[in-house]
């Protein structure tokens, strides 16, 4: 329905927060489009934060806590998303410093309510794990699993979340996290889109 609405020129432009259609579908809309954290097509601007810096900050947090076996959990499976770079940088930094880092791709096809079960399976599979890096929602489930297994947080299990969402701020035990500059990203998205709209006119 929203594609029909856009094709009938009921909107002046689009900010893509999620990628749902084929690239050609967006290009055929003939509307100004800006994407958040996903490279839809060469002619569609992509706005994203400094994921390399985010990966370095997260790795630094792990290194200063002398962790031995770290799980690097990503829900990103494509190079089209710049966010995959934070996990690459994180993993490379730990390995260069002699820390065991296991790179794991999260099954995003599962429902959110099934994340806890998937996390429990990870703890069973990697009993030597003493730290984890991932997005806030996944880390929240990790903290719950670790606590229920009697692990002392953060002495026995260290986590670093990424995004700085409300979930991270309300987490218990409290979560260490890297915040994305949400306001700056939003301002840039709107600014770029308005320039495209005005340019088109």
Regions found by a protein language model. Name each.
Residues 1-8, 55-56, 102-126:
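Structural motif
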Residues 58-99, 201:
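An alpha-beta-alpha
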Residues 47-72, 112-120, 180-198:
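Hydrophobic alpha-helical segments within soluble ligand-binding/sensing domains
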Residues 1-13, 88-94:
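Amphipathic helical "hinge" segments at domain boundaries
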Residues 69, 101-103, 153-158:
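Short acidic capping loops at alpha-helix termini that bridge into adjacent secondary structure
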Residues 17-57, 163-175:
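Flexible loop/hinge segments that line or gate small-molecule binding clefts
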Residues 120, 125-133, 137-201:
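Flexible loop/turn connectors
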């Amino acid at each position: 329905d929203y594609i029909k609405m856009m094709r009938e020129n009921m909107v002046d432009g689009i900010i893509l927060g999620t990628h749902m259609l084929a690239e050609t579908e967006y290009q055929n809309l003939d509307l100004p489009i800006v994407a958040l954290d996903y490279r839809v097509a060469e002619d569609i601007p992509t706005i994203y934060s400094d994921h390399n810096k985010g990966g370095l900050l997260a790795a630094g947090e792990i290194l200063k806590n002398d962790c031995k076996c770290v799980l690097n959990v990503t829900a990103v499976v494509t190079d089209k998303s710049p966010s995959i770079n934070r996990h690459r940088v994180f993993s490379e930094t730990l390995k260069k410093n002699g820390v065991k880092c296991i790179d794991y791709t999260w099954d995003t096809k599962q429902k959110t309510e099934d994340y806890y079960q998937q996390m429990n399976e990870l703890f069973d599979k990697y009993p030597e794990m003493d730290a984890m890096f991932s997005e806030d929602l996944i880390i929240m489930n990790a903290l719950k699993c670790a606590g229920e297994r009697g692990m002392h947080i953060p002495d026995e299990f260290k986590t670093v979340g990424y995004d700085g969402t409300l979930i991270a701020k309300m987490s218990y035990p409290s979560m260490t996290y890297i915040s994305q500059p949400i306001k700056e990203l939003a301002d840039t998205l709107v600014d770029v889109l308005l320039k495209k709209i005005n340019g088109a006119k």
